[in-house]
């Protein structure tokens, strides 16, 4: 039995590593598609339609017996889940990616659990005790993570790996960056494209955090996880299709080249349908704290893949800010894990406490069937006669 549980846990760990690698590949592939010139709204529409066509039938078959009936409260919750987690999350991410690069886009993503904790604290679904080490670790980790995000916005630094700023002026990525190589110039000369991209990425993380904060209480009342995802994609796709209908005037925007078609298929099948399925399955086995610990792998995977396939430079600011974000994330997730572990231990105390022992062992003749001990803990001496 233990070996089976251990095998399932190892499979979940491998699955989470795959999820982060798939997300890193998504950042690189979509950056290539955006450089070609695909419309962001059109890209999101095709991606969501593909994901919805996969998730809807799977949710109908898999959650057929566990899916509760729909009501107005659930529909309203799915509406906001689609608005934040699908529509706002995806669109802001693509706009931010178009103005920055895959390394920065992936480096900000690990802040999602921290933003989720802040929103959950405001909503009352998360508790905070500053007199305990876990509570102090949560606050300290949040501050460190925010400081890392601010550092990435205000400081770029030297190109430690890859081409320098002068050497990369001919590439598509540099067309979206400041020629001075520093972000502070954008605050004096107006908001630059790179600064706008970073703000969109922060908005992307905020939308995803709101999605997770709203989803947590919904899943308690609507335990069909895959159906929740499918309904969220339904409303998000409706938002995306409606926006694309009014904001894209030329029919040529809906035509895809070969590379764009490959990016759309990858985004819909791998980055959406498969990743959401693996996240849900791994969350049931490992729990949310351990699953969140794998998010810091995303910047490393994206930086490595973008350096190989795009030749994107890796700057000092991204390394320092990314390290701060990862450190803050680990602090928050460690504190959450310790709190849940302590709560689980407190739940076992009434069963294993000494006060309960006399009720079990006082009369060994009336002990329950299937007790762990086959003999009485206090054996009577046998007569020598």
From Swiss-Prot:
Single GO MF descriptor: transmembrane transporter activity
Alphabetical list of InterPro entries matching this protein: EamA_dom, WAT1-related
Transmembrane segments: 14-34, 41-61, 75-95, 104-124, 141-161, 194-214, 226-246, 261-281, 285-305, 308-328
GO cellular component: membrane
Topology versus the membrane: Multi-pass membrane protein
Keyword terms, alphabetized: Membrane, Repeat, Transmembrane, Transmembrane helix
Localization, UniProt: Membrane
A family per Pfam: EamA
All residue ranges annotated as the EamA domain in the record: 23-153, 216-333
Family recorded in the similarity comment: Belongs to the drug/metabolite transporter (DMT) superfamily. Plant drug/metabolite exporter (P-DME) (TC 2.A.7.4) family.
The protein's name in its UniProt record: WAT1-related protein At3g45870
Lineage: Eukaryota, Viridiplantae, Streptophyta, Embryophyta, Tracheophyta
């Amino acid at each position: 039995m233990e070996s089976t549980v251990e095998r399932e846990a190892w499979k979940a760990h491998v699955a989470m590593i795959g999820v982060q690698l798939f997300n890193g590949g998504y950042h690189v592939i979509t950056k290539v598609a955006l450089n070609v010139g695909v419309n962001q709204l059109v890209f999101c529409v095709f991606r969501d339609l593909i994901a919805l066509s996969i998730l809807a039938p799977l949710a109908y078959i898999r959650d057929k017996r566990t899916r509760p009936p729909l009501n107005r409260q659930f529909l309203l919750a799915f509406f906001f889940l689609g608005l934040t987690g699908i529509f706002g999350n995806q669109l802001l991410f693509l706009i931010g990616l178009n103005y920055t690069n895959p390394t920065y886009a992936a480096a900000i993503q690990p802040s999602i659990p921290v933003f989720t904790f802040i929103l959950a604290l405001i909503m009352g679904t998360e508790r905070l005790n500053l007199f305990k080490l876990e509570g102090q670790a949560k606050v300290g980790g949040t501050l460190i993570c925010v400081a890392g995000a601010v550092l990435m916005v205000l400081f770029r630094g030297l190109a430690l790996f890859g081409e320098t700023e002068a050497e990369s002026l001919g590439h598509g990525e540099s067309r979206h960056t400041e020629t001075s190589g520093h972000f502070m110039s954008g605050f004096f000369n107006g908001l630059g494209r790179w600064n706008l991209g970073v703000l969109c990425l922060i908005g992307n993380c905020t939308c995803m955090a709101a999605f997770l904060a709203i989803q947590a209480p919904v899943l308690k009342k609507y335990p069909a996880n895959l159906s929740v995802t499918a309904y969220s994609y339904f409303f998000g796709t409706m938002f995306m299709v409606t926006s694309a209908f009014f904001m894209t005037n030329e029919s040529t925007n809906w035509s895809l080249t070969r590379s764009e078609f490959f990016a759309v298929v990858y985004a819909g099948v791998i980055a959406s349908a498969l990743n959401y399925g693996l996240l849900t399955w791994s969350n049931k086995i490992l729990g949310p704290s351990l699953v969140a610990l794998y998010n810091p792998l995303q910047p490393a995977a994206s930086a490595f893949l973008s350096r190989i396939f795009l030749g994107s430079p890796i700057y000092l600011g991204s390394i320092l800010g990314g390290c701060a974000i990862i450190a803050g994330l680990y602090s928050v997730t460690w504190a959450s894990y310790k709190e849940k572990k302590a709560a689980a231990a407190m739940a076992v105390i009434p069963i294993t406490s000494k006060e309960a022992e006399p009720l079990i062992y006082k009369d060994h003749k009336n002990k329950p069937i299937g007790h762990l001990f086959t003999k009485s803990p206090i054996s009577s001496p046998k007569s020598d006669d």
